[in-house]
Regions:
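Short glycine/threonine-rich loop-to-helix capping motif typified by GTGT followed
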Residues: 11-18, 47-54, 114-115, 214-216, ...
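Aromatic-residue-lined binding/catalytic grooves and analogous aromatic/hydrophobic interfacial grooves
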Residues: 2
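Long, contiguous, secondary-structure-rich segments that constitute the structural scaffold
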Residues: 182-229, 316-331, 335-394
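Active-site rim elements
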Residues: 7-10, 171-178
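Glycine/threonine-rich phosphate-binding loop and adjacent beta-strand/alpha-helix elements that clamp
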Residues: 154-174, 189
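Short, well-ordered loop/turn and helix-capping segments at boundaries between secondary-structure elements
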Residues: 25-32, 125-128, 146-153, 190-197, ...
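Extended redox/cofactor-interaction regions of prokaryotic respiratory oxidoreductases
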Residues: 22-142, 151-158, 170, 234-340
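Stable alpha-helical elements in mature extracytoplasmic
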Residues: 10, 19, 181-184
Length: 394
């Protein structure tokens, strides 16, 4: 069973994933040939977001916003603060004010902010904002006190170890003063806490990870060797749970409190979550918000992808992506379009309780009559970037 963002980013994401895992378990399709494979991170490298979290004192760690949401914050998977809690702290100043925001390669008012007007109002309150990006985006223009140009992949010596394989990226060019975000983090770290950033450059940092923070099976420990090999796969094995390869103590079993596959999730129970898969109605659905549904009688989805773009990237004029897909599109079924007197290609306003945007209609016969499917991530670099236009993002 494969799943993607349709499962990952919904109200019921965790519970749905739990249900799918249960199906794997009761049918015996776990880490076996033809079944669902349990993938380990390449050569034992740490996959958690936020490198260096262990260097913070317990007092500083306790101040992380969103600790009351333990699934990510206490599971060791992410050291990041809870995004909604950060937004609330900016708005209210509680439990403490957020005075500075640093954003790297993100364009939230065009893309990841589900409530862009709210996010716009909040980020305007922050004392100092740094944006590190490839392009001057609506987010950079709207909020940044300082814009730092980011290096593209061909301008970076780096590695990628998100699961497998381990991949080496080799720098082949340099444009002006652009640097990679890892090098930028090292530069800032050396000024703030040099004792925690002893490496002389980004390559030295990577080599230190290979030497000191892997399981000892990685086939290289210096960058020159890695450049020649380009990528490296760790040895692959089925039935890792039977060989002690899933638990930090090296014992057979799964990385759960009981060591078994748990249909009744004991860790969820400990954290105060329902230990069994369950359904929760979305907060703005026709069932949970009937009065809102009377005003806005279509269910709007915004997660659909277009093959030409990745989130808010590649919108520049002259780019082949914009030539193939020049305008933002939304979809209705033939019946829903006819009911509203709309035809293919019409420009329409799409509105809900959070705001509105304008996109062109594409009629999709496969779509449910109760649903409108809109694209996300749109902005128009060819338009004026200054306030209030902000490249047409609003």
């Amino acid at each position: 069973i494969q799943w993607g963002l349709k499962v990952d980013q919904t109200t019921n994401a965790t519970s749905t994933a739990d249900a799918v895992n249960t199906l794997w378990a009761i049918t015996g399709n776990v880490d076996n040939p033809g079944g669902n494979i349990i993938i380990r991170n390449a050569f034992g490298q740490n996959l958690s977001y936020g490198y260096g979290y262990h260097l913070l004192s317990p007092e500083m760690q306790s101040k992380k916003l969103g600790a009351e949401f333990p699934l990510l914050s206490r599971a060791g998977y992410s050291s990041s603060a809870h995004a909604d809690s950060v937004l609330a702290a900016i708005e209210t100043g509680k439990p403490y004010p957020i005075r500075m925001v640093w954003m790297t390669s993100t364009n939230p008012i065009a893309n990841m902010g589900a409530d862009a007007p709210r996010l716009y109002r909040a980020l305007k309150k922050v004392d100092f904002v740094v944006v590190n990006d490839l392009f001057m985006t609506p987010t950079a223009v709207a909020f940044a006190d300082l814009v730092l140009p980011a290096a593209m992949s061909p301008e970076r010596d780096s590695q990628r170890c998100w699961w497998v394989p381990n991949r080496t990226m080799v720098k082949v060019t340099q444009h002006e003063e652009c640097v990679g975000d890892d090098v930028l983090a090292l530069m800032v770290g050396k000024r703030l806490h040099p004792e925690n950033f002893p490496w002389k450059d980004g390559i030295d940092w990577i080599e230190s990870i290979w030497k000191n923070e892997t399981d000892g099976t990685i086939p290289y420990t210096n960058f020159d060797e890695a450049k020649k090999q380009v990528w490296a796969y760790p040895p692959f094995e089925y039935y890792k749970y039977a060989k002690g390869l899933l638990r930090p103590d090296g014992q057979p079993g799964f990385n759960t409190p009981t060591g078994r596959i748990e249909l009744w999730n004991s860790q969820f129970s400990l954290w105060g979550y329902d230990p069994l898969p369950h359904f929760k109605e979305p907060s703005c659905s026709p069932v949970s918000a009937p009065e809102l549904y009377k005003k806005y009688p279509l269910v709007l989805t915004t997660g659909a992808r277009s093959y030409e773009f990745f989130h808010s990237e590649h919108r520049q004029p002259g780019n082949i992506s914009r030539e193939l897909h020049p305008d933002p599109l939304f979809e209705l079924s033939p019946a829903a379009a006819e009911e509203r007197g709309l035809q293919e290609g019409d420009w329409c306003w799409i509105e809900n309780q959070r705001g509105r945007c304008r996109q062109r209609l594409h009629i999709n016969p496969s779509l449910d009559d109760r649903v409108a499917r809109a694209e996300h991530g749109w902005w128009f670099p060819e338009e004026d970037g200054a306030e209030p236009t902000l490249f047409g993002v609003f």
